[in-house]
Amino acid sequence: MSILGLFQKRSSGAVARDRLQLILAHERAESGRPDLVIQLREEILAVIANHVAVEPDKVKVTLERGEGVSTLGLDIELPLGASGKLDAKLAAKLAEVAANKGGAKPASSKKAA
């Protein structure tokens, strides 16, 4: 665009198109994918079901969007075993995940008494 083009009147169609594109871009950025939380919840529930039986209504997934950051919240009510403790296999897996998150090496697979 030349300097003379700066002072030229734009057609109303071009202005409307630009405004609509701007509105759509803002709405897409605000809403994201509405089905994302539902899909994440289903996939997380399927993975957890491989290790322990969990009632689907006891799994809550939230996605909060902030300035440049999205936070995924996960709240799972795990059932207690007959002895009042988590299943040993699940407890070991949770400990391994927690250790890996901190940058530590996975714990050895020793059986607890």
From Swiss-Prot:
<keyword id="KW-0132">Cell division</keyword>
<dbReference type="GO" id="GO:0051301">
    <property type="term" value="P:cell division"/>
</dbReference>
<comment type="similarity">
    <text>Belongs to the MinE family.</text>
</comment>
<dbReference type="Pfam" id="PF03776">
    <property type="entry name" value="MinE"/>
</dbReference>
<dbReference type="InterPro" id="IPR005527">
    <property type="entry name" value="MinE"/>
</dbReference>
<comment type="function">
    <text>Prevents the cell division inhibition by proteins MinC and MinD at internal division sites while permitting inhibition at polar sites. This ensures cell division at the proper site by restricting the formation of a division septum at the midpoint of the long axis of the cell.</text>
</comment>
<dbReference type="InterPro" id="IPR036707">
    <property type="entry name" value="MinE_sf"/>
</dbReference>
<keyword id="KW-0131">Cell cycle</keyword>
<protein>
    <recommendedName>
        <fullName>Cell division topological specificity factor</fullName>
    </recommendedName>
</protein>
<dbReference type="GO" id="GO:0032955">
    <property type="term" value="P:regulation of division septum assembly"/>
</dbReference>
